[in-house]
Amino acid sequence: PIETISARMLDYYVGRNDALIIDLREEKAYAESHVRGAVNIPYETLENRKDLPMNKILVFYCDRGGASMAAAREFVRRGYRTRSVIGGFTAYRGRNLVSGDR
């Protein structure tokens, strides 16, 4: 089963050494705002990525939660530990919001 977390729980993973937060949205959306520390890997390019660390929990978020579930499912199949954010970035109202390229 895919582990899901609420958008509020996303703050728990920010800044942790054992987690990698991945923003699956388009580059333009990421540039406008994103969760602090998140790396931008647009969903369309994710399938070809072979360089993601096996020793970290991959925390995926997208716009509303659909793509992140699909990504989490795929990477669990590859042997990773994953989390998918329910409701995606749209639901996130946490304190780790970054606007622009800060």
How does the language model describe each region?
Residues 1-20, 27-57, 63-102:
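Rhodanese-like catalytic fold shared by cysteine-dependent sulfurtransferases
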